[in-house]
């Protein structure tokens, strides 16, 4: 899908967990969005002190309403300022960007395991919706730091079985998503995952020979492959071989890039 740029209007902004916000934008640009796993590059406002856009993954798309939903963590100056924006405000958006999850890898009737960690959870929701529509059976394992950080448990339950893990044990299973997968003996035909690098490393080590795809979280400058700020090296490749996470990714087959 060719990238576009335009202005979208904030129609909803809600804190859904500690420092995590659900942002719903509306406008014609949404008609160009369809692939799960892509992201939008959002300019927070027109001030000169925040020139760089913020990459935010797409959590859901409603083409009929021309609305796109994103969930982001207000951790830095830019995202905190975005969290303060009110309904009715217009924001400048570039996107959709990147290569998303390959839906065609999961065939009708196959078992799919979605594994998300923290702010890596949102893009898996729209992916799960599309997979269920295509006839796949979806199980989700979602990891968070603590109960205060948990979001979207109920929406994921509408897709299939859901397992929640918290690092401090305050909600769901104590520990990490990999612990839950082992304890519940969860198996799959295809795995899709997005989350922090340590989680992706653990999944890569375990499922290198399986049908599995990971989405990398990375700071980005331009979002279109021009600045080389989000380069990662190719597994077993030559020294000069690399991938740009913003354009070649953020989704890669497991084992393709060095984490």
From Swiss-Prot:
One of its GO terms (biological process) is 'de novo' UMP biosynthetic process. Coiled coil: none annotated. Residues 3-103 form the FAD-binding FR-type domain. Its cofactor is [2Fe-2S] cluster; FAD. It comes from the Bacteria. Pathway: Pyrimidine metabolism; UMP biosynthesis via de novo pathway; orotate from (S)-dihydroorotate (NAD(+) route): step 1/1. Keywords: 2Fe-2S, Electron transport, FAD, Flavoprotein, Iron, Iron-sulfur, Metal-binding, Pyrimidine biosynthesis, Transport. FAD binds at residues 54-57, 71-73, 78-79. [2Fe-2S] cluster binds at residues 222, 227, 230, 246. Pfam families: DHODB_Fe-S_bind, FAD_binding_6, NAD_binding_1. GO terms for molecular function: 2 iron, 2 sulfur cluster binding; electron transfer activity; flavin adenine dinucleotide binding; metal ion binding; oxidoreductase activity. Binds 1 [2Fe-2S] cluster per subunit. Responsible for channeling the electrons from the oxidation of dihydroorotate from the FMN redox center in the PyrD type B subunit to the ultimate electron acceptor NAD(+). Belongs to the PyrK family. Heterotetramer of 2 PyrK and 2 PyrD type B subunits. This is Dihydroorotate dehydrogenase B (NAD(+)), electron transfer subunit.
């Amino acid at each position: 899908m060719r990238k576009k740029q335009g202005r979208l209007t904030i129609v909803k902004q809600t804190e859904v967990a500690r420092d995590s916000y659900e942002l719903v934008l509306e406008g014609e640009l949404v008609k160009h969005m369809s692939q799960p796993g892509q992201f939008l590059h959002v300019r927070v406002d027109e001030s000169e002190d925040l020139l760089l856009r913020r990459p935010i993954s797409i959590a859901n798309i409603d083409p009929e309403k021309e609305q796109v939903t994103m969930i982001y963590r207000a951790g830095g100056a830019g995202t905190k300022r975005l969290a303060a924006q009110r309904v009715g405000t217009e924001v400048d958006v570039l996107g959709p960007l990147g290569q998303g999850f390959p839906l065609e890898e999961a065939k009708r009737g196959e078992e799919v395991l979605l594994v998300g960690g923290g702010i890596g959870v949102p893009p898996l929701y729209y992916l799960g919706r599309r997979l269920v529509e295509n006839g796949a059976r979806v199980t989700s394992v979602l990891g968070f730091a603590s109960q205060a950080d948990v979001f979207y448990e109920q929406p994921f339950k509408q897709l299939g079985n859901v397992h929640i893990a918290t690092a401090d044990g305050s909600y769901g299973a104590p520990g990490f998503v990999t612990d839950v997968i082992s304890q519940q003996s969860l198996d799959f035909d295809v795995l899709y995952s997005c989350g922090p690098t340590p989680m992706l490393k653990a999944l890569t080590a375990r499922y290198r020979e399986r049908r599995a795809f990971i989405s990398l979280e990375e700071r980005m400058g331009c979002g279109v492959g021009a600045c080389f700020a989000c380069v990662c090296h190719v597994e077993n490749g030559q020294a000069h071989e690399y991938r740009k996470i913003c354009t070649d990714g953020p989704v890669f087959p497991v084992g393709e890039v060095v984490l």
